[in-house]
Amino acid sequence: MEYDRTYSIRKGEYFADALKRAGKDFIPTNCIINKLLPGLGATHCELTAPRKSIIIEPNVPVIESKAKKHKNALAVYKGVTIRKVADFLEENRDKHYKLLTTPEGFTKIKEAMQAVEIDMYTECFILFDECEKLVQDVHYRDSIREPMNDFFRFQNKALISATPIIPEKDN
């Protein structure tokens, strides 16, 4: 089993370009990605991937702007109802829909999926972007960890960060 793989991103390339050179069409599953640099288009890569996705981002402005730029995408955060999410899922059931959410909005997606009888754990890929925020922000934003209760139940998943927290070595 492979535990560590490096994909080099050349000057002028995006994350998707490096993946394609390595024979991957989109973000691999069941991995933790340290992309080293922000702004390489990893989230864009998932937004254009031919699969149903839940993308967790730490901030509302990011999910709003990304959802506006992509078809079959819905931003889920405070003020978006479970009914709206369920309606979106019904309308896009046969498409590669993208649900962008804050960690706090994840529960709405979970409830909407249950309401329309979609098994999110088998039908969707989940990407936790800026996953370092789980550790950095939990002391003042306890609900940021809520999606982790479900994360490992997904068959297809990935954590990604340009600024991961490196564990301290034991002395």
Q: Where in this protein do the model-derived segments appear?
A:
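Pre-Walker A adenine-sensing motif
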Residues: 1-29
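Well-ordered, non-membrane alpha-helical segments in soluble/globular domains
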Residues: 13-22, 82-86, 108-115, 140-148
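Walker A/P-loop
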Residues: 21, 25-48
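Short glycine/proline-enriched coil/turn segments at helix->beta-strand junctions
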Residues: 29-32, 48-54, 68-73, 122, ...
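Conserved Walker A/P-loop ATP-binding site and its immediately adjacent core
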Residues: 38, 42-81, 104, 164-168
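Inter-Walker segment of RecA-like/P-loop motor cores
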Residues: 71-115
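SF2 helicase catalytic motif II
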Residues: 103-106, 114-159
